[in-house]
C-alpha cells in the first residue's frame, strides 16, 4: 500500500506512507508543503497545487517528478476528523530534537526530551510550525515525520482492528481514492505487520530538497530519498510497480 496522506489544514501537511508486508516495513516520508511541483505549465508549491486542484492532482504532480507506484492512492482528511480518529489511541511520546533546535523547541514550550502529546496538541503544534516563516520547510516537515513515526510505532498492535474501520466510519468526510477493496488490503497488511515475528522496519524521514530564495525544489537528494523510501535500487526506481500490498 502506498498512500499520499494530506491533512487539509490552512497549510496542508503531506506524508507519503508505504506499508509492505513482503518487505515487513512501514516507511513514512514527510513532504514539505513548499516543495515545487509541475502544475498549470509552471512549478508551484505543493500546497498551492492542493488548494487549486485537490489531493488527486497533488499525487499526479508528485508522480511526474518521482517514481511513485502507479497505484499510489491519496487520502485527504480534515484536521478535526484526523484528531478524532487519532484520539482513541491516546497521547504518543515524541522527541523533536532531530527536527528542531533546543531554541526552536523552547519557543513553543517544548523540551528536548521525549514528551507525551495528544492528537489535538500535535495538530496545533504542527500548524504553528507550518506558519512560522523563520523555519525552513524541512524543519516543520521533520517534526511532522516525528509525530507520525511515534504514532505507528506505539499504536501498531491496535491499528489492524481500528484504523481501517475508523476510516470507513468517516468515509463521507474524506477525499480519497481508497476503495473498500483497498481498505481490506490495508487491514490485512496491518494485521501481518502487527503480528510479525520479525521486527518491523519503521522509518520516518523528510524529503530533502534545495531551499534557496524562498523556493524548495527537487534535487538529486530528493530522488535518492524516494528510491530509498521504496527500498529500490536506482535502476528499479524507474519501474516501480507497487505490486506488493
Please give the residue ranges for each predicted region:
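Entry/capping segment at the start of metal-dependent catalytic domains
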Residues: 1-29, 127, 190, 225-226, ...
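Extracytoplasmic
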Residues: 9-14, 23-31, 57, 69, ...
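C-terminal solvent-exposed extensions
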Residues: 10, 27, 35-42, 173-245
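Extracytoplasmic/secreted envelope proteins and their assembly/folding machinery
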Residues: 13, 55-63, 79-87, 123-126, ...
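Flexible, solvent-exposed short loops/turns enriched in glycine
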Residues: 24-54, 98-112
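Second-shell loop/turn segments in exported
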Residues: 44-53, 65-73, 130-139, 155-159, ...
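Amphipathic, coiled-coil-like alpha-helical scaffolding segments used for oligomerization/assembly
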Residues: 51-111
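Flexible, polar/acidic helix-loop-strand segments at domain edges
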Residues: 87-169
Amino acid at each position: 500500500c502506498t498512500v499520499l496522506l494530506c491533512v487539509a489544514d490552512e497549510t496542508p501537511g503531506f506524508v507519503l506512507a508505504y506499508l509492505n508486508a513482503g518487505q515487513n516495513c512501514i516507511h513514512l516520508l514527510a513532504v514539505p508543503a513548499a516543495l515545487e511541483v509541475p502544475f498549470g505549465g509552471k512549478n508551484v508549491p505543493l500546497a498551492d497545487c492542493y488548494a487549486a486542484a485537490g489531493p488527486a492532482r497533488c499525487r499526479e504532480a508528485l508522480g511526474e517528478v518521482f517514481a511513485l507506484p502507479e497505484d499510489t492512492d491519496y487520502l485527504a482528511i480534515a484536521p478535526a476528523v484526523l484528531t478524532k480518529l487519532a484520539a482513541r489511541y491516546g497521547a504518543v511520546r515524541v522527541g523533536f530534537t532531530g527536527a528542531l533546535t533546543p531554541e526552536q523547541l523552547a519557543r513553543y514550550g517544548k523540551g528536548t526530551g521525549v514528551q507525551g502529546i495528544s492528537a489535538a496538541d500535535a495538530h496545533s503544534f504542527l500548524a504553528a510550525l507550518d506558519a512560522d516563516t523563520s523555519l525552513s520547510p524541512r524543519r516543520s516537515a521533520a517534526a511532522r515525520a516525528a509525530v507520525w513515526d511515534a504514532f505507528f510505532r506505539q499504536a501498531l498492535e491496535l491499528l489492524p482492528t481500528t484504523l481501517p474501520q475508523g476510516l470507513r466510519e468517516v468515509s463521507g468526510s474524506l477525499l480519497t481514492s481508497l476503495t473498500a477493496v483497498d481498505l481490506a488490503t490495508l487491514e490485512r497488511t496491518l494485521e501481518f505487520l502487527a503480528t510479525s515475528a520479525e521486527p518491523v522496519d519503521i522509518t520516518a524521514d523528510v524529503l530533502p530538497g534545495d531551499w534557496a530564495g524562498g523556493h524548495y525544489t527537487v534535487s538529486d537528494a530528493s530522488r535518492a530519498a524516494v528510491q530509498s523510501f521504496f527500498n529500490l535500487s536506482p535502476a528499479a526506481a524507474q519501474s516501480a510497480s507497487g505490486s506488493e500490498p
